[in-house]
């Protein structure tokens, strides 16, 4: 029988852009190699650089699983440095960011550990990341119970993005995405905010606090940003609701001008997650003349490469 302590030895660590400085020219290496997936990385890097210079509305869209990894700190740093000015993500992002901001520690594990054993040891498994029970649900519940009453005292109804700024304001962890978003006043749009521990705890506490989230105000904000921008671009990591919400709203301005997809999903099953940018063109979500690229691979490998290239 494996002891719990034997599994929870090596914590996941957040990275920042400074950790990637010595790799800033790595895309030039891929440019020389060129063949097969390397070309996608090179093309995506070039588009991303041009997008950041040219587009005034720059979306960072990603799925929550990545926030359990060291990419969390990198996302926060990209926001702090001004590369992106709006985030679209999922409810789990809030869970992981809050949990890790207030003492929750995630650990390096394996895809192959016995899950029944992990359950007995009170450890969740997220891919090869291990999340002790005490580092997740309990932490989030305590945070919401602590902070929501003082937030609700002044605001009985609040847009979700403002609520997330309020939580970000109360975070001191420099690796926090919510903290970075609050400091830079970057809206974090979470269309599925009720889907997760944070959303569930908001619902429970709302029964006692007469507190409501106004998601229509989030829609109004993203509408105003899209309609008022000259050009928009997006780095879309993964699929699902965060990908769709990003491209959905851009159809109302005749589509994104720039789009870089990082994905492992395939298009043969007709899924939104696997759909390539060219399909979005048919829906008016990406302009026919837009610059776009699809990079296939694990985001924990691809995203640091793209981020490093921004420093060159």
UniProtKB/Swiss-Prot annotation:
It catalyses: [eIF5A protein]-L-lysine + spermidine = [eIF5A protein]-deoxyhypusine + propane-1,3-diamine. It is an enzyme of class 2 (transferase). The active site is at residue 285. Its cofactor is NAD(+). It comes from the Archaea. Its EC number is 2.5.1.46. GO terms for molecular function: deoxyhypusine synthase activity. Disulfide bonds: none annotated. GO terms for cellular component: cytoplasm. Pfam families: DS (PF01916). The keyword Transferase applies. Keywords: Hypusine biosynthesis, NAD, Transferase. Gene3D superfamilies: Deoxyhypusine synthase. Pathway: Protein modification; eIF5A hypusination. PANTHER family: DEOXYHYPUSINE SYNTHASE (PTHR11703:SF0). Catalyzes the NAD-dependent oxidative cleavage of spermidine and the subsequent transfer of the butylamine moiety of spermidine to the epsilon-amino group of a specific lysine residue of the eIF-5A precursor protein to form the intermediate deoxyhypusine residue. Belongs to the deoxyhypusine synthase family. This is Probable deoxyhypusine synthase. The lineage of its organism: Archaea, Thermoproteota, Thermoprotei, Sulfolobales, Sulfolobaceae. The gene is dys.
């Amino acid at each position: 029988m494996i002891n719990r302590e034997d599994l929870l030895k090596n914590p996941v660590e957040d990275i920042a852009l400074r950790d990637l400085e010595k790799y800033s020219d790595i895309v030039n290496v891929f440019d020389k190699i060129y063949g097969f997936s390397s070309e996608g990385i090179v093309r995506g890097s070039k588009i991303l650089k041009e997008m950041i210079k040219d587009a005034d509305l720059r979306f960072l869209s990603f799925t929550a699983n990545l926030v359990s990894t060291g990419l969390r700190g990198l996302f926060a740093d990209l926001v702090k440095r001004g590369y992106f000015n709006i985030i679209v993500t999922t409810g789990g992002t809030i869970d992981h960011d809050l949990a890790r901001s207030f003492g929750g520690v995630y650990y390096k594990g394996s895809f192959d550990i016995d899950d029944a054993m992990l359950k007995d040891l009170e450890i969740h498994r997220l891919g090869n990341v291990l999340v002790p029970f005490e580092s997740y649900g309990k932490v989030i519940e305590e945070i919401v119970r602590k902070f929501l009453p003082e937030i609700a005292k002044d605001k009985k109804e609040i847009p979700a993005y403002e609520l997330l700024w309020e939580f970000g304001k109360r975070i001191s962890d420099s690796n926090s995405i919510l903290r970075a978003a609050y400091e830079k006043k970057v809206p974090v749009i979470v269309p599925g905010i009720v889907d997760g521990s944070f959303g569930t705890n908001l619902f429970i506490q709302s029964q006692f606090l007469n507190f409501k989230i106004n998601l229509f105000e989030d829609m109004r904000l993203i509408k105003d940003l899209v309609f008022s921008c000259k050009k928009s671009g997006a780095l879309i990591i993964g699929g699902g609701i965060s990908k769709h919400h990003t491209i959905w709203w851009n159809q109302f301005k005749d589509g994104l001008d720039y789009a870089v997809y990082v994905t492992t999903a395939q298009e043969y099953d007709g899924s939104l997650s696997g759909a390539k940018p060219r399909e979005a063109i048919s829906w008016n979500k990406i302009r026919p003349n837009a610059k776009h690229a699809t990079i296939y691979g694990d985001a924990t490998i691809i995203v640091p490469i793209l981020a490093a290239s921004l420093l060159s």
